[in-house]
Curated annotation (Swiss-Prot):
InterPro entries named among the record's database cross-references: Hexapep, LpxD, Trimer_LpxA-like_sf, UDP_GlcNAc_AcTrfase_non-rep
Keyword Repeat: yes
Protein name from the UniProt record: UDP-3-O-acylglucosamine N-acyltransferase
Task performed by this protein: Catalyzes the N-acylation of UDP-3-O-acylglucosamine using 3-hydroxyacyl-ACP as the acyl donor. Is involved in the biosynthesis of lipid A, a phosphorylated glycolipid that anchors the lipopolysaccharide to the outer membrane of the cell.
An annotated Gene Ontology molecular function: N-acyltransferase activity
Pathway as given in its UniProt record: Bacterial outer membrane biogenesis; LPS lipid A biosynthesis
EC number from the UniProt entry: 2.3.1.191
Organism placement in taxonomy: Bacteria, Pseudomonadati, Pseudomonadota, Gammaproteobacteria, Vibrionales
Record SUPFAM superfamilies: Trimeric LpxA-like enzymes
Pfam families documented for this protein: Hexapep, LpxD
Length: 343
């Protein structure tokens, strides 16, 4: 990690330092493991009681916890946000590529901006446009007429199909495939006929996509991922899906075709969203949610049975299977009571 002075940390975070600004830190560490030379943070107040024992060179805290610190304190509005900014500043992760490798295969008409880097054995097909500071890792494939905006970075073995576009400042992790065919077939008396997928995928600015995620191209119109969306690992985004500004989706989630997800949504991991539905802005769905119909109002939604012991779960499952029978018996009892009241 890059070394920084406490004065530099204060500038990066916009915080107020109480202590020696000349001291240097070279690592970010959890509060219970931090040592001299480390910077740490307190985001959960329940751990404030441990501040007096913390050995870090500096702790990033809210103002109400400053006096509990054993040493230097950096007072910030949000310690977790400050932590994120400090890690960004200290990050020394290598780039996917540093220059244009001799083994890269690049079509003669590819338009490249300044400071483009392309790793070994990457293939860049005809008509591709690469913005300034684009970095393409080893073994990537960029199909015909695809476009990558300024500062966009692809790690090794990413596949970008033909005519797909990514905006500025995007990050795509290894193994992800963008623009493969959507799942479109017509059935002619038992024979499946493939429907060519003629749309594409349009991805906005500052979008991050995790490893081994798949985003299908649209059937006729485009699949759309708006600005500031974050998609985790191993997601399946089907054809013609639209994902609104600032939405986040953890790993394992599946979104069926033509579903529209609003702005600032949070979709819990391993959730499944049915096709041709609409999710309103600001909806949060807890993990393993099964969304079968549209959600029209902002709020928190859940489905599924929380973890139980196997014995408890078997009892619950048995009761669930008996609900229809119990409902019939309840209606019969209600009818008998109504008859008694009438008599």
């Amino acid at each position: 990690m890059k070394k920084l002075t406490l004065a530099e940390l204060a500038t990066i975070t916009g915080g107020e330092l109480f202590g020696d600004e000349s001291l240097v830190v070279g690592r970010v560490a959890p509060m219970d493991k931090a040592q001299e030379g480390d910077v740490t943070f307190l985001s959960n107040p329940k751990y404030a009681k441990h501040l007096s024992e913390c050995k870090a060179t500096v702790v990033m805290v809210k103002a109400e916890h400053k006096d509990q610190c054993a040493g230097n304190a950096l007072v910030v509005a949000d310690p977790y946000v400050a932590f994120a900014r400090v890690v960004q500043a200290m990050d020394t992760t290598p780039k996917p590529a540093e220059d244009i490798a001799p083994s890269a295969v690049i079509a003669s008409d590819v338009k490249m901006g300044e400071n483009v880097a392309i790793g070994a054995n990457a293939v860049i097909e005809t008509g591709v446009e690469l913005g300034d500071n684009v970095v393409i890792g080893a073994g990537c494939f960029i199909g015909k007429n695809a476009k990558l905006g300024n500062n966009t970075k692809l790690w090794a073995n990413v596949t970008i199909y033909h005519e797909v576009s990514l905006g500025d400042d995007c990050l795509v992790q290894s193994g992800t495939v963008i623009g493969s065919d959507g799942f479109g077939y017509a059935n002619d008396r038992g024979e499946w006929i493939k429907i060519p997928q003629l749309g594409s995928v349009r991805i906005g600015n500052r979008v991050e996509i995790g490893a081994c995620t798949t985003i299908d191209r649209g059937a006729l119109e485009d699949t759309i991922i708006e600005d500031n969306v974050i998609l985790d690992n191993q997601l399946q985004i089907a054809h013609n899906v639209q994902i609104g500004y600032g939405t986040v989706m953890p790993g394992g989630t599946i979104v069926a075709g033509s579903t529209k997800i609003g702005k600032y949504c949070q979709i819990g991991g391993a959730s499944v969203l049915n096709g041709h539905i609409t999710i309103a802005d600001g909806v949060a769905i807890t993990g393993m949610g099964m969304v079968m119909r549209s959600i029209e109002e902002k709020g928190l939604y859940s489905s599924g049975i929380p973890l139980q012991t196997n014995r408890e779960w078997r009892k619950t499952a048995t009761r669930v299977h008996r609900i229809d029978e119990m409902n019939k018996r309840l209606k019969a009892v209600e009818k008998q009571l109504e008859q008694k009241e009438e008599s």
